[in-house]
Amino acid sequence: MKFQYKEVHPFEYRKKEGEKIRKKYPDRVPLIVEKAPKARVPDLDRRKYLVPSDLTDGQFYLLIRKRIHLRPEDALFFFVNNTIPPTSATMGQLYEDSHEEDDFLYVAYSNESVYGK
């Protein structure tokens, strides 16, 4: 997926910002969260998040559901590197496994369980 944040901000800017955040908040994970293409769910009010590294994917899922005002019966899926992460994984584990060279972890969300549909 092409993240709009990457399109708008050059790599050098993102890298500098990511390093600054990680240095200032070593126990937190910097995230870029964007809606997947063709997803039929509301947009988030912001893209950048700084979450505790011990927050689970499941807890973050609930936070995002609340921010986009999804009804209980509406589906929501996260993708990290085009795969759905386990809800028991901590954001710190996901960050260590999947963060990009700019020191951000990129997360896409969608109402479909198949990436890009």
From Swiss-Prot:
The keyword Lipoprotein applies. A lipid is attached at residue 116 (Phosphatidylethanolamine amidated glycine). The keyword Lipoprotein applies. GO terms for molecular function: GABA receptor binding; phosphatidylethanolamine binding; ubiquitin protein ligase binding. Ubiquitous. Expressed at very high levels in the brain, heart, peripheral blood leukocytes, liver, kidney, placenta and skeletal muscle. Expressed at very low levels in thymus and small intestine. It holds the Pfam family ATG8. Its main location: cytoplasm. One of its GO terms (biological process) is autophagosome maturation. Residues 117 form a propeptide. Residues 1-22 are annotated as: Interaction with beta-tubulin. Residues 36-68 are annotated as: Interaction with GABRG2. Keywords: Autophagy, Cytoplasm, Cytoplasmic vesicle, Cytoskeleton, Lipoprotein, Membrane, Microtubule. One of its GO terms (cellular component) is cytoplasmic vesicle. It is a lipid-anchor. The record marks 116-117 as: Cleavage. Belongs to the ATG8 family. Ubiquitin-like modifier involved in autophagosome formation. Whereas LC3s are involved in elongation of the phagophore membrane, the GABARAP/GATE-16 subfamily is essential for a later stage in autophagosome maturation. This is Gamma-aminobutyric acid receptor-associated protein-like 3. It comes from Homo sapiens. The lineage of its organism: Eukaryota, Metazoa, Chordata, Craniata, Vertebrata.
